[in-house]
From Swiss-Prot:
It comes from Prochlorococcus marinus (strain NATL2A). This is Putative membrane protein insertion efficiency factor. InterPro entries: Membr_insert_effic_factor_YidD. The lineage of its organism: Bacteria, Bacillati, Cyanobacteriota, Cyanophyceae, Synechococcales. Belongs to the UPF0161 family. It is a peripheral membrane protein. It comes from the Bacteria.
Length: 79
């Protein structure tokens, strides 16, 4: 039962990020300092680690995406 709930929550997270990528991000243009972009990172993190750890990794990544952090490659960690 918990696995089904986790899958449903992961689907909601990925759907929200995909909505952002399709409808909101184009209004602002590319602004992420990292490769992959923060939204692509979020989708990969949730798909790879599940909604809770993937969501946490995404929040940590978003907190680093500002002008005081150097640009670069920041892949999703392996399990």
């Amino acid at each position: 039962m918990l696995t089904k709930i986790n899958k449903a929550i992961a689907l909601v997270f990925v759907s929200l990020i995909s909505f952002y990528q399709k409808w909101i991000s184009p209004l602002f243009g590319p602004s992420c300092r990292f490769i992959p972009s923060c939204s692509a990172y979020g989708i990969e993190a949730v798909n790879k680690h599940g909604p809770w750890r993937g969501g946490w990794l995404t929040l940590k990544r978003l907190s680093k995406c500002h002008p005081l952090t150097p640009c670069g490659c920041d892949p999703v960690p392996e399990k």
